[in-house]
Amino acid sequence: MVHQVLYRALVSTKWLAESIRSGRLGPSLRVLDASWYSPGTRQARKEYQERHVPGASFFDIEECRDTTSPYEMMLPSEAHFGDYVGNLGISNDTHVVVYDGDDLGSFYAPRVWWMFRVFGHRTVSVLNGGFRNWLKEGHPVTSEPSRPEPAVFKATLNLSLLKTYEQVLENLQSKRFQLVDSRAQGRYLGTQPEPDIVGLDSGHIRGSVNMPFMDFLTKDGFEKSPEELRAIFQDKKVDLSQPLIATCRKGVTACHVALAAYLCGKPDVAVYDGSWSEWFRRAPPETRVSQGKSGKA
């Protein structure tokens, strides 16, 4: 069997700092701040304007999505994504490094990492430890806005990394894919509410396994080692040699499952983009499981 050589999914703060110092930023290397925070908490764009990694552009996940969809954070079209990242100076030959400023060390960056991959881009990495550790280690920051020269990016959707509602519904019968839910246990069980949203009860898709995405991160905000990640999958009886779909509430933290599996040598985890936000509104009641007061989500 021929093993696929995987592009490095993580780069260190030290590597990025040295790359910036040595003048490597440009058409061949771009940095993106993909921070996003719940309304009424922190303001991602304002924080970016105040301080960011030198040369980084702001990737606004609210803009680079399907704004016509009734569901949260759905993927944009190929043309939309290509135009958006092209305007950030990214071409099909660019190595893209993504970070965010979340206190956990990483939250939205893996979503943007996955978005690039699902649109056919191989050379994309997450900054391990995020902006939290960039600051902690004393690396330089700036308020200088980034003005990269626009580039041409041709997006080609890789459908093998994306699952739809219909495919997940069919999978309840065929069981061809394992299904992992990356939300916190209380939300998965239905005993804690979904935050920042009205009309969406908590619970999970029947047959899914709960693997909270925070378990993939160390207390210092770094990705755990491949050995530790494999042990987490094994503990949950998730077989990395078999097909796997990741889900969450809106297709964001599910990408942490895809990243963790990738770091274990499995690059083909698909994300259910609509996730619980869509499933709750569309799926038959018997496919929604909850330990909440109603017994069903």
Curated annotation (Swiss-Prot):
One of its GO terms (cellular component) is mitochondrion. It catalyses: thiosulfate + hydrogen cyanide = thiocyanate + sulfite + 2 H(+). Glycans are attached at S35. The modification Phosphoserine is found at S38. SMART domains: RHOD. GO terms for biological process: epithelial cell differentiation; rRNA import into mitochondrion; rRNA transport. PANTHER family: THIOSULFATE SULFERTANSFERASE (PTHR11364), THIOSULFATE SULFURTRANSFERASE (PTHR11364:SF6). Contains two rhodanese domains with different primary structures but with near identical secondary structure conformations suggesting a common evolutionary origin. Only the C-terminal rhodanese domain contains the catalytic cysteine residue. Monomer. This is Thiosulfate sulfurtransferase. It comes from Mus musculus. The gene is Tst.
